[in-house]
Structure formats: C-alpha cells, structure tokens
C-alpha cells in the first residue's frame, strides 16, 4: 500500500464527481493490471487488487505533479474512471479516504455501516452526504455493489410478523413482538420462521393501518414489510435474501397510480438507471396483487377517492408502458393503459373508506391466501353492511371476469411497440 498526504481542512464543496471513460492513461506500458483478466480470483481479493492498483497509480500521478488526476483500476480505456481537476481536490481526498476504509474492511473481513465509516473520518467528510457520494463513486469505480465491499446499509424499511432473526453480536430480534428495522445486517443472520408469505406495502401509513386492524391475528403466518416509499437498497436486498433462502412467496401492495406501479417495478427489476452500488438489489419473485386501477370497478370505490391524472402522470405512464411490454408485464401494461383511458388514479387509502378491515379481508386475503374460509367472517353479511354504510361493495363475478378480459387492443399494442423502438431509456 502507498501513503499520501491528506488535508482534512479542505472545503467540502457540494456537487457530483466528474466521471467519464478515461482520456489519461499510464505512460508505462508494463503497468500491472493483469488481475482484471479472466483468471479465477475470489471477489474479495479481486476488489482488493483493484484498490491497490488505483492507489499506486494515483500516487504515481501525484509524484509526477500531473495537473489533472485520474482514479482508475486499469490502464484499459474500456474501464470506468474518476477524473479530478485542481478544484476537485476535496472530492479526491474524500474518495481516497473511502478507498482506504474499504480496503481495511476487506483485508480484515469486517463489515461497517456508512454511519460508522463517516465517524471514523468525520473531519475529512464534513457531512454524511459527502461520504455517501464517495461510496457511490467507489462502487462505480470498482464495479462492485456496496454489499460486496462490506459496507452495510441502515435502511429505512421495517418488517413485522412471523419471523425471528438471530444476528451475530446483536442477539435475537423477534419481529413477532416488535417492528424490526431492515438493515444489511439481517443478510447475515439465521432465520426462524414458519411464515407462508411476505406482503410488501408501499407506504408506512398502510403498514400501520394494517397493524392497527389486527394483521397479525388475521394472518398469523404472514410477514408485513415496507420501505416507506421508494424501495431502498437494504430492503430490496433483505427481501431478495428471504425469497431465495426461505422461498417465501412475496406479494406487493401499492398505490394505483404511476408512482406506485413504478415502485413495484423497482422492487422486481431494480431502478431503470442502475448503479454498481445497488447492483443485484431486486426481488424477481415479487408479485403485484393491487391496488389495481381496475379495482375501482371490482370494489365499487367511491368516485370521490379518484384523483385526476396530471401532465407528469401521463409523461411517466408513457415512459413506463414500453418498459412493461419489454419486461413481459402484461398486467402492468393493461393497468397503465386503463389508467390512461380513464384519466384517474387512486391511493391505497381509498379502499379503507369501504369499511373497517376491508383491505385485509377483501383485497389481501383472497389474493394472497386464497383461503377466505379460514378467516372467521361471513363475507355476504359484511359486504352488505359495508355497502349500506359506505356505498362500497365487491363487484359481481361477471363484472370481475369482464374486467380481467379488458386487455389492450391491437392498435394500442402497435402504438406501444413504436414507443419501445423510439424510447431513449
């Protein structure tokens, strides 16, 4: 390893790092970047070799007093690199500190949260957001996910239900009796659970509403989770681990609007613009069970709960339809088209207006469990009661079947195909 001087008093200017395919390359033809060849090297050792090369190369540039410095893992022109001008010296300082911290984690087989890394060199980073920026840059440089660099995420997601985690150096975390914060530490835990499924809901308000309405009593073998909006990397990683390790079926419940459907696609496939930091953080087995825009007719939701689509909604839908077709998401494509035709959207809360525990009993139970008989209720009586009190009811089987057959016509499909061909995303 090479040592170099840091200046902890450098101003911590905001702004993103300049990054591009390098136009500055080593003037030495015998630079050793053979570790990037197709030899079999453990991922940990490969990442460490990349860091060693990057630090040695940047030291050579500093010794040569080059005006513009380039952080790279190879002399190959095809590899991603980070370039710094004299004005970006503060950013370079932070990125080099981050590289050293990551190397230490890998070398000593340790794991650390972003917050812990920040406090190790608080004087250098100045603010948590600057460390976050450096981590993102380093992940892109090394082409490694955050998890592969032993950096743990303290996500904002929570989980509750029939699952217990045995976490090293922490102990027993029982989600049956308390909400559990979803962090990357759960990825390395032992799991005790006899759950039948995991239900992911978009928002914390829906999560709390279901808990208040006795979700655990209705679904004693169920697990409820939320990322409180846009799905963070830690939540996606943990859900993916649970689906792979324990084969839990995972279902998703989101708003019947463009944003909610986009969140579902992000859970299942990752973001449209993927960065190395979160590579692989998606849950391919998740199944969307609602709220569908077409549920407006299935549950006869009151018209007052419908919100008109605005211009940004139409723009988002037009971008999402080609993607849904490419992904083979027939239901998503159909629901987006229905939304355009009817020009309104709904939030999950709209179905709560139909009555107490209505979402759990008549939306979740039939679609997740398909065992309405196991829930101690009398559907016909309750449906009639809700219909009288709040003008909400289930549609008839004929109505439901008719709506299920409401697919996109051939003209629309041709239009969407043209959108795919011209799509810039």
From Swiss-Prot:
According to the UniProt record, where is the region Disordered?
1-38
Q: State the needed cofactors, names only.
A: Mg(2+)
Subcellular compartments: Nucleus
Gene Ontology biological-process entries: meiotic cell cycle; meiotic DNA double-strand break formation; meiotic DNA double-strand break processing; reciprocal meiotic recombination
Does the keyword field hold Isomerase? yes
What are the residue boundaries of the Topo IIA-type catalytic domain, all occurrences included?
Answer: 15-158
Identification of the protein by name = Meiotic recombination protein spo-11
Q: Which organism is it from?
A: Caenorhabditis elegans
């Amino acid at each position: 390893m090479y040592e170099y001087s840091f200046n902890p008093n450098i101003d911590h200017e905001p702004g993103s790092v300049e990054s591009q395919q390098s136009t500055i390359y080593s003037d030495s033809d015998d630079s050793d970047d053979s570790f990037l060849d197709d030899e079999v090297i453990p991922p940990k050792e490969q990442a460490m070799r990349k860091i060693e090369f990057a630090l040695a190369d940047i030291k050579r540039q500093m010794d040569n007093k080059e005006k513009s410095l380039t952080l790279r893992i190879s002399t190959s022109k095809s590899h991603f690199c980070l370039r710094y001008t004299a004005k970006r010296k503060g950013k370079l300082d932070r990125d080099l500190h981050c590289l050293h911290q990551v190397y230490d984690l890998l070398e000593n087989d340790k794991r650390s949260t972003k917050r812990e890394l920040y406090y190790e060199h608080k004087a250098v980073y100045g603010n948590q957001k600057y460390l976050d920026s450096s981590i993102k840059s380093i992940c892109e440089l090394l082409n490694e996910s955050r998890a592969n660099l032993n950096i743990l995420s303290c996500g904002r997601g929570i989980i509750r239900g029939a699952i217990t985690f045995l976490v090293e150096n922490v102990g027993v975390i029982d989600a049956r009796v308390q909400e559990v914060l979803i962090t990357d530490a759960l990825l390395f835990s032992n799991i005790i659970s006899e759950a039948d499924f995991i239900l992911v809901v978009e928002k914390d308000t829906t999560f709390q509403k279901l808990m208040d309405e006795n979700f655990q009593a209705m679904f004693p073998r169920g697990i409820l989770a939320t990322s409180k909006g846009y799905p963070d990397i830690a939540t996606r990683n943990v859900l993916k681990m649970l689906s792979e390790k324990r084969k839990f079926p995972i279902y998703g419940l989101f708003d019947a609007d463009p944003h909610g459907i986009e969140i579902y696609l992000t859970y299942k496939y990752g973001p449209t613009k993927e960065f190395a930091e979160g590579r692989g953080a998606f849950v391919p087995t998740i199944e969307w069970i609602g709220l569908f825009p077409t549920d407006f007719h299935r549950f006869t939701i009151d018209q007052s709960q419908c919100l008109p689509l605005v211009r940004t909604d139409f723009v988002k839908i037009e971008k999402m339809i080609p993607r849904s077709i490419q992904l083979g998401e027939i239901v998503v494509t159909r629901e987006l088209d229905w939304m355009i035709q009817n020009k309104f959207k709904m939030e999950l809360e709209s179905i709560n207006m139909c009555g107490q525990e209505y979402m759990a009993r008549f939306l979740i139970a039939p679609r997740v469990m398909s065992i309405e008989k196991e829930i101690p209720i009398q559907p016909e009586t309750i449906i009639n009661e809700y219909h009288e009190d709040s003008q909400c009811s289930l549609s008839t089987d004929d109505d439901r079947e008719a709506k299920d057959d409401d697919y996109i016509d051939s003209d629309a499909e041709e239009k969407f195909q043209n959108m795919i061909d011209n799509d810039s995303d």
